[in-house]
Every structure is written in structure tokens, then in C-alpha cells.
Amino acid sequence: MQERHTEQDYRALLIADTPIIDVRAPIEFEQGAMPAAINLPLMNNDERAAVGTCYKQQGSDAALALGHKLVAGEIRQQRMDAWRAACLQNPQGILCCARGGQRSHIVQSWLHAAGIDYPLVEGGYKALRQTAIQATIELAQKPIVLIGGCTGSGKTLLVQQQPNGVDLEGLARHRGSAFGRTLQPQLSQASFENLLAAEMLKTDARQNLRLWVLEDESRMIGSNHLPECLRERMTQAAIAVVEDPFEIRLERLNEEYFLRMHHDFTHAYGDEQGWQEYCEYLHHGLSAIKRRLGLQRYNELAARLDAALTTQLTTGSTDGHLAWLVPLLEEYYDPMYRYQLEKKAEKVVFRGEWAEVAEWVKAR
């Protein structure tokens, strides 16, 4: 059983999306995990807490004995069955605990006794986490081109289509605005950073990467924030601004926020509940900027949103949403973005419609 413990080994694990059987407790996994990890804990949260208390009060030997007592009999067999199945399903995988200590070694020895030799991560999650942090710091030093533009300019799609593009919003599972949530819950901050590091490592490994193409994001993307090392580099980066006609932007927003979100909600929840979730999603987005709109203007737009939803429900048409979307863009989102762009005008190196910016980026 060969353990992997060099920096290059850790990076190779992330680049290859090597399946990781993470045997830490669920609470630890939720706080931060690697992208390709599945959580099959040696101890659940309560068992881990009990063993931790025992360790503090009575020492390591007593804690180890308690752990073996808690994970015994049918409980141990159930967990063994899960580990065995995961090992057989992921023969190229690897075991991981917090620091490559007792938990992963215990599971490894139990599997060995059952006839399965499976490697473990020496240094555990902590070593992988440090590798992810260091990789982001290093890779962020490469030149960056940011794709800017008003809401609905197709910036995310443009980034996605570049071989050296990294979709920060996709990784964060959020589109960055008040209406930015998706049906996928956002990851913990550590898990988001790990996912970002893995994506940057994989993208860099696929080619002789000269520069990154990223969307011009603020520090926060929903509840996740960009690593400071990357954010600092982005503040110094050149910006290419997409300037598409207003009507084209409206078409994109209609497709993304009304047609697609309605489809996604009904697909996930069924027609009736999906419709309610979709309505709540739009109202929540508008409510999030109530103070900035002012109460009177918010109430006017909320009433128009209600009318648009009624029309959509009865006719299937999303055209009614223009009655609140157009003023929201003209009075709030567009002025806000233009103000932000003015503050970094010296960083703008190219302006053009979507296809022109895409061609310019391709030539870099």
C-alpha cells in the first residue's frame, strides 16, 4: 500500500479528480472538502464528539478504546460495507482523514484485513488543503484578462468558451447578483476555494497557459468570496468590455432568469411547487435590493412582477417581465455597473460586441 505524500502527488490528485474516500465526520466534511471526495465517515458527529471529550479527559488510549467500542458490531459492518463498495467502485481512489492519522489508518487496516489494499493520503485533508491554497497563490500570478459588461452581456458564456477561462460563478454556484442563486446550494468557503484550485490546476495542466480569462467579479459571489490572492490580481488586470445592444441583453436575461429558472424549478419540484419556488426566487431577488431602490419604486416593480407572473402562469409568455426588468436595468443595474467601471477605466483595453470581444480574447 503506497501512500502519496509529495506536493506533486497532492496536485496530481486534484488534477486527476482522483476519488477520495473521506472518513472524517460529516461536520468536518461540510466545513471543507476536496471536489472529488465522498464522505463515508468512520465516526458520525456524535461519536466523534464523545471520543474528543474522552481524549481531553482521559487521554489517547481511552479515546481509542471508546472509538472501537462505538464503532463495533453492526455499525462497523455497515460502514465496512460502504467502504468496500466505494473501493470497488473507485479502484484508483484514496483514503483521507483530517491529517492522515488514526482514522484513515484504522479504515485502511480494516479494509486490508478484508482483502482490499487501498492507499491513503499522508497528511490527510490538511495537506491537500494547503496544496490547494498554495496552488491558487502560484497560479494567480499569471496574467489575467477580465471580461466586463452590463448585466445580460453574456460574460459567463464567453468565459466558458475559452480554453483558458475559469467560470468563477459556476464554481460558486451563484451568478453574483441579487437574482444570482441557483438550485444548487453554495459550498462552504473552504470547499469553494478547493474547487477553484482544482479547476485552475486542471486548466493549467491541459495547455501551456499564458493567461487566465475570468469574469469581472466583485469580491463576493453570493456567500463565497474570492481568495485574496486572486482578488488582488484581478484588481490589476486588463478588462475587455462587452457592449451588446440592449435588446440582445434582454433576450439573454429572459432565457436565463425566466425560461431556464422556471424550467429548473419545475423539473426539481414539480409543476405546482416549482412554480411557487420560482415566484419566491424572483420576489426574493427584488426584495434584496429594496433599500437601494427605495420603498415606493420597489412596490411599483413588485406589483409589475406579480402581474408578469400572472401572465406567465396563464399564457406561458414571459414578455410581461419586461415591465419591471427594463426599469430595473436602466435605473439600477446599468448605472451601478457603469459607475464601477468608471473607477477602473484605465484598465479597459478593449470594447466591442460579444463576438468581437470573443475574437479579441482568442488572439491574446
Curated annotation (Swiss-Prot):
InterPro entries: Rhodanese-like_dom, Rhodanese-like_dom_sf, SelU
The keyword Metal-binding appears for this protein: no
Highest taxon listed in the record's lineage: Bacteria
Top-level class of the enzyme under EC nomenclature: transferase
Pfam families xref list: Rhodanese
Domain Rhodanese, first and last residues per copy: 14-137
Record keywords, A-Z: Selenium, Transferase
SMART domains referenced in this protein's UniProt entry, alphabetically: RHOD
Active site: 97 (s-selanylcysteine intermediate)
Molecular function GO labels: transferase activity, transferring alkyl or aryl (other than methyl) groups; tRNA 2-selenouridine synthase activity
A GO BP annotation: tRNA wobble uridine modification
Enzyme Commission number(s): 2.9.1.3
SUPFAM superfamilies, per the entry: Rhodanese/Cell cycle control phosphatase
Catalyses which reaction(s): 5-methylaminomethyl-2-thiouridine(34) in tRNA + selenophosphate + (2E)-geranyl diphosphate + H2O + H(+) = 5-methylaminomethyl-2-selenouridine(34) in tRNA + (2E)-thiogeraniol + phosphate + diphosphate; 5-methylaminomethyl-2-thiouridine(34) in tRNA + (2E)-geranyl diphosphate = 5-methylaminomethyl-S-(2E)-geranyl-thiouridine(34) in tRNA + diphosphate; 5-methylaminomethyl-S-(2E)-geranyl-thiouridine(34) in tRNA + selenophosphate + H(+) = 5-methylaminomethyl-2-(Se-phospho)selenouridine(34) in tRNA + (2E)-thiogeraniol; 5-methylaminomethyl-2-(Se-phospho)selenouridine(34) in tRNA + H2O = 5-methylaminomethyl-2-selenouridine(34) in tRNA + phosphate
Disulfide bonds: none
Family (UniProt): Belongs to the SelU family.
Function: Involved in the post-transcriptional modification of the uridine at the wobble position (U34) of tRNA(Lys), tRNA(Glu) and tRNA(Gln). Catalyzes the conversion of 2-thiouridine (S2U-RNA) to 2-selenouridine (Se2U-RNA). Acts in a two-step process involving geranylation of 2-thiouridine (S2U) to S-geranyl-2-thiouridine (geS2U) and subsequent selenation of the latter derivative to 2-selenouridine (Se2U) in the tRNA chain.
Subunit architecture: Monomer.
Alphabetical list of PANTHER family matching this protein: TRNA 2-SELENOURIDINE SYNTHASE
Annotated protein name in UniProt: tRNA 2-selenouridine synthase
The species this protein was found in: Shigella dysenteriae serotype 1 (strain Sd197)
Organism lineage string: Bacteria, Pseudomonadati, Pseudomonadota, Gammaproteobacteria, Enterobacterales
Gene behind the chain: selU
